[in-house]
């Protein structure tokens, strides 16, 4: 396996699950959003404020291309990374892709106190999350090798299911 790539909506558990998978597989863990922050010295909300979403998405595309070219990495992507066809191609070519699916209720609960999510700076985050999932879900599914439900499941159980399901996949 080249890389293990996690996609899915905000609050699906990509970073938490990714860290655990990396530890289990003894691989480095990378979060594309955190890597952008490290590289720029600015947090994601600041980048959104100063450059707008298109500016952030340009940075994200460059970072995903770089990280997917690596070998032996567990990568958690931002929720909107799949919106650009270039990213979908890079992610699919970069390794095995796992779509972590979470219900809107779970997403709201997991993101409620996180101030680092510019798209959720709204009076009705559930509506925004629902709209985003409706648009993004087909793209997550398009590139996923496997889809994993994360609702009300301990991260360790999700990790074990991912490892078992990956072992069942034919080589590509």
From Swiss-Prot:
Entry function = Catalyzes the specific phosphorylation of the 3-hydroxyl group of shikimic acid using ATP as a cosubstrate.
Write down any Gene Ontology CC term. cytosol
Subcellular location per the Swiss-Prot or TrEMBL entry = Cytoplasm
The portions of this protein that span the membrane are: none
Quickly give the catalysed reaction: shikimate + ATP = 3-phosphoshikimate + ADP + H(+)
Task: Give the E.C. number(s).
Answer: 2.7.1.71
> What cofactor does this chain's UniProt record say it requires?
Mg(2+)
Question: Where is Mg(2+) annotated to bind?
Answer: 15
Q: Where is ATP annotated to bind? A: 11-16, 117, 153
Question: Could you tell me which PANTHER family the record lists for this protein?
Answer: SHIKIMATE KINASE, SHIKIMATE KINASE 1, CHLOROPLASTIC
Q: Name one GO molecular function term.
A: shikimate kinase activity
PROSITE patterns found in the cross-reference section = SHIKIMATE_KINASE (PS01128)
How, per the record, is the cofactor bound?
A: Binds 1 Mg(2+) ion per subunit.
Question: What binding partners and quaternary form does the record give?
Answer: Monomer.
List GO BP terms, alphabetically.
amino acid biosynthetic process; aromatic amino acid family biosynthetic process; chorismate biosynthetic process
Q: Which CDD domains match?
A: SK
Keywords annotated in UniProt: Amino-acid biosynthesis, Aromatic amino acid biosynthesis, ATP-binding, Cytoplasm, Kinase, Magnesium, Metal-binding, Nucleotide-binding, Transferase
- Cysteine pairs forming cystine bridges in this chain are none
Q: Can you tell which superkingdom this protein's organism belongs to?
A: Bacteria
Q: Which InterPro entries match?
A: P-loop_NTPase (IPR027417), Shikimate/glucono_kinase (IPR031322), Shikimate_kinase/TSH1 (IPR000623), Shikimate_kinase_CS (IPR023000)
Q: In which pathway does it act?
A: Metabolic intermediate biosynthesis; chorismate biosynthesis; chorismate from D-erythrose 4-phosphate and phosphoenolpyruvate: step 5/7
Where, in this chain's numbering, is substrate bound? 33, 57, 79, 136
- HAMAP family assigned: Shikimate_kinase (MF_00109)
UniProt protein name: Shikimate kinase
The record ties this protein, via Pfam families, to:
SKI
Query: What does the similarity note say?
Result: Belongs to the shikimate kinase family.
Name its species.
Answer: Pseudomonas syringae pv. syringae (strain B728a)
